[in-house]
Amino acid sequence: MALAVIAMAAYACSTVPLTGRSQLSLVSDDQINPAAAQSYRTLLSDPSTKVVNTGTDAQRVKRIGNQLAVAIDSYLKNNGYGSQYNYQWEFNLIQSKEVNAWCMPGGKVAVYSGILPVTQTDAGLATVMGHEIGHAIAHHSAEALSQQMAVQAGGAAVGAATGNKSQTTQALIGTLYGVGGQLATLKYSRDKENEADRLGLTFMAMAGYDPRQAVSFWQRMAAQNQGAPPEFLSTHPSDATRIANIQRLIPEAMKYYKGK
């Protein structure tokens, strides 16, 4: 068992853009992105999902999302990561009272209308979208799958890591994301949350949004939470810790900010 885990760890490691962190990578984009895209389409086509296609808010989500995507794609290409990412970006607004947003592997983004009163401004919306996109760019879900496979260290898991990918990978993705298009938001460790904050701040700065405005968004989120974070933040750092970390990261992000 131990030898299998060591062999798999040596078999595939990757580096997170910008942060330079090494991570276990037994699941490729070619494996996880199509499954994520299918889950995204299933969710959006579900009769209970109310996708907003018209109006100012829907246009804002798509506009800011596309600005982030252009900036991110340019950064990845210019820094030697272009061949590792082939994201087919999509940005949709979902009508819901839920205070939520997420980005699935491959760049499939959803913003729930319930979070818009908290974002308030374009910079606020860029903050939360940049953060969720940060999880995807850092391959946090693929890393979680890889860690599950390493723990299992069985024939099926090794097979998925070395090419027999369809059934096992789909099953593991189902475990993380739920079955039948019902998205179960991934719960990341605090280290992953901090990494997504760092990436998100930089991405919003690259897209022309002042990363200093992220502090205001998280302060509004703290007031919204009233001590009880929404489900998608349930394993995130405390509000005070996150805001302090963001303030510490702002000088780095400002290096990429040129304004609009």
Language-model features and meaning:
Residues M1-K260:
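A Zn2+-metalloprotease active-site environment signal
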